[in-house]
Amino acid sequence: MTHSIVAEGITSCDVLVVGAGPGGGNAALHSARAGLDVILIEDHPAIGTPVHCGECISDIACDNLNLELPPHVISKRVHGIRVIFPDGTAKKLTEEGYVLEKHLFERWIADEA
């Protein structure tokens, strides 16, 4: 079942975003920052749940997306990550960034939008 919260009386918008995950949340956030009227629709009763996987974001991504992360969404500061692919090969990425509390990050993005 789809759940949505839409302010009473809203009949139109400039941007309709379906899905409040990291991609949809960012689309809604940047559309709202651009002065557009945005409606964000999520099919789960609470944005950020159920948690499907962890989430990391680099400093470069934060800069490119113009995100200033609030402390409550950050789980840990990291100075690189090691990615292990399904075939067992590994690659080390040295970009600094954050491990996020994904459910809190998604809720924050939606609230900001």
Residues of each region from the PLM?
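Extreme N-terminal leader/targeting segments of oxidoreductases
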Residues: 1-15, 33-34
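Conserved N-terminal helical subregion
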Residues: 80-113
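Glycine-rich FAD pyrophosphate-binding loop
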Residues: 16, 20, 29-52
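Conserved N-terminal glycine-rich FAD pyrophosphate-binding loop of Rossmann-like flavoproteins
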Residues: 44-68
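N-terminal Rossmann-fold NAD(P) dinucleotide-binding loop
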Residues: 24-25
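Short, well-ordered alpha-helices that flank and scaffold nucleotide-derived cofactor binding pockets
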Residues: 29, 33, 63, 111
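Conserved glycine-bearing catalytic or ligand-binding loops at nucleotide- and phosphate-handling centers
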Residues: 77
